[in-house]
Design a protein with these regions (language model features):
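N-terminal small/glycine-rich loop or linker at the start of catalytic domains
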Residues: 1-22, 106-113
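Glycine-rich, proline-tolerant flexible connector loops at the mouths of alpha/beta enzymes
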Residues: 18, 43-66, 114, 171-173, ...
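Alpha-helix-loop-beta-strand connector modules within alpha/beta enzyme cores
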Residues: 2, 8, 55-81, 128-135, ...
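Mid-to-C-terminal alpha-helical segments outside catalytic/metal-binding sites
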Residues: 246, 250-275
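Catalytic alpha/beta core domains of metabolic enzymes, predominantly
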Residues: 104-227, 238-239, 243
């Protein structure tokens, strides 16, 4: 039984301090939340960045400052910067973090409804993102909000338009307008990826804990964090990303699973070890 990889999505692009005052905006706040998640058991940090006033940005320099500050404190953590950004951003804006040559980055696998907005990921956009990641030696985390997104990216991999096996998928379930977060849907998604692939689930909102437990039982991995959910339980806001990660650790240990550290996560994900 492989160890469980926990990813912490520490701020996202949508959630605000008005919803939970612990949501990080500044560089110092991002480092604080990164450390809380790492110390609780997260091997991976999924990174969005904000301006100090909370405005989402895909600016290369802002990503560099934030990621450098985190790396100084957590030298072995895996960071996966977002290329999803926020709805309405151009593909050129969204690609900026790949200029930093991270180990991994997200690649969203199709257009979908996103609440009242459209998350636009056309085939030309996806090809451009795949080309950049191939050129820069970046392993994508393929974010799939709908079942068709899996088929789309598998077809692209066969054509060499995106990096192929071993592939890492993140199933984002529970976004309003996309695939509901049910155990049946999660199992179906997981059954559609190639042998040798790895996968993680992001359960959005109240679905976070059901999806976490189901993924652990199925042999998958788990993403939690303020981007996806700000509550530990009904009416109980988390005081940090670390509290959310710690809850996943408790669930995993009750189910007999050990937690992967960053070195073990790199091996599971077929990443190069740190030098």
């Amino acid at each position: 039984m492989e160890k469980l990889i926990i990813t912490a999505a520490i701020c996202g692009a949508e959630v605000t301090k008005a919803q939970n005052e612990a949501v990080p905006y500044t560089v110092e706040e991002m480092v604080r939340e990164a450390k809380s998640a790492y110390e609780a058991g997260a091997a991976i940090l999924h990174i969005h960045v904000r301006e100090d006033d909370g405005t989402p940005t895909q600016g290369r320099e802002r990503f560099k400052v934030v990621m450098d500050a985190i790396r100084k404190e957590l030298p072995d953590v895996i960071m996966i910067p977002s290329t999803g950004g926020a709805t309405g951003m151009s593909p050129e804006e969204r690609l900026q973090p790949t200029e930093l040559y991270p180990e991994m980055a997200t690649l969203d696998c199709g257009t979908c409804n996103f609440g009242d907005e459209i998350f636009d990921n056309t085939m030309p956009t996806m090809r451009a993102f795949g080309k950049r990641m191939i050129e820069n030696g970046i392993k994508p985390e393929y974010e799939c909000f709908e079942l068709g997104h899996i088929d789309t990216v598998l077809g692209m991999a066969k054509k060499g338009e995106v990096p192929g096996n071993p592939m890492q998928f993140n199933f984002v379930l529970g976004v309003h307008g996309c695939t509901p977060a049910t155990v049946e849907n999660l199992a179906f998604f997981a059954s559609k990826i190639p042998a040798g692939s790895t996968w993680t689930v992001s359960g959005v909102g109240r679905a976070a804990w059901t999806m976490a437990a189901a993924a652990i039982a199925m042999g998958g991995n788990v993403r939690v964090g303020f981007e996806d959910n700000i509550y530990l339980g009904k009416g109980q806001k988390a005081a940090s990303n670390g509290e959310l990660v710690a809850k996943v650790v408790r669930i995993a240990k009750e189910l007999g699973h050990e937690i992967a550290n960053p070195a073990e996560a790199r091996e599971i994900l077929s990443l190069k070890p740190l030098q």
